[in-house]
């Protein structure tokens, strides 16, 4: 028995050593990439963040990301609720379609939007003042298409993990589905919803593939921070590109920290199903 226990401990120690070694390798790989951006971006950082084109790109990125995230959350909340709390028709097919969108290349999503808004319907919208192709409005549309499935998944997971017994009790006492949603489900998932909003905003800030396909990158018109990096690399201005990348890295780090702090449950930890 003692010999069997010793062999089991050796196997466990070997497995632990392999997993720790793999984790350290992954951390080193990711840390090297982050360090390369920081080291290369520091020399020109102060000058770059004061340049007119980077300031324009920063303002446009923050504005479009904020607008698109508000729209995404407004659409994702009822969609996630319908997928988790109702018997909507084709619910399984709808969920699979949303998951499929997550696996598609962003440039393909941008191409689909370009086809839609270059169609007669898109031209009609343009004639009536809603121009999307090669305009800042197109950036918002690209962000919405890319991030909406992601937000739906986050919110859907939060809704599925919430304790439904409280909603059942409220409904037996005469509460409407809207009342249960507003007074029970949203407060229970407040931390997860806050994290979903912040992470969706961060993804919108860094989105580039769909935006490039739909609106292109033009200085002082459709130039976001990722677009600014792209233009700097295209013109051989690598120091400015790395400094801009460092700025995006700092913003991403701050948003991640904010999501960790604000995304905590008001009860100290997230409620688990059945507890």
Which residue stretches match the model-derived regions?
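Membrane-helix/interface signature in polytopic inner-membrane proteins
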Residues: 156-167, 177
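Glycine/proline-centered hinge or cleavage motifs at structural transition points of membrane proteins
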Residues: 173-174, 187
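Glycine-rich helix-loop "coupling/hinge" segments at transmembrane-helix boundaries
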Residues: 210-236
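Membrane-water interface segments at the C-terminal ends of transmembrane alpha-helices
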Residues: 8-43, 52-160, 188-208, 232, ...
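Short hydrophobic faces within alpha-helices
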Residues: 100, 166-173, 241
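Short coil/turn motifs that cap or connect alpha-helices
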Residues: 89, 176-177
